[in-house]
Amino acid sequence: MMDVEVLSEREFEGGWSFELRLGDGDDVTRTLRLSWADYDLWSNDGGDPPHAVAAAVAVFLLSRITASDLPATLDAATARRRYPDADEKIPKLIRR
């Protein structure tokens, strides 16, 4: 499994933006946006730190595609749109 490190977190109107380092030897940096709506969907009780949800989304996406194939900036909802099992699997990947 590829390592995901949250380098920075920034809140904006409607959600958060995270700079992530995705690495397994060749480090790749990507920006992931997480809306409040997607956070509420994946953090069932709302008790998870937003950065943990963002990291879980990245881990999920990396189980499907390579880090270099991810766009430089992406929205977390991309996981839901592309992969029907995202809503089931992402909450299980959140590290508490």
Residue ranges and their predicted role:
Residues E5-E9, L32, D48, K92:
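Domain-level signature for proteins that mediate thiol-based redox and metal-cofactor handling
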Residues G23-T29, A67, K89:
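Intrinsically disordered, low-complexity linear regions
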Residues G25-W42:
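Short acidic, glycine/tyrosine-flanked loop/strand segments centered on an H-E-D-like triad
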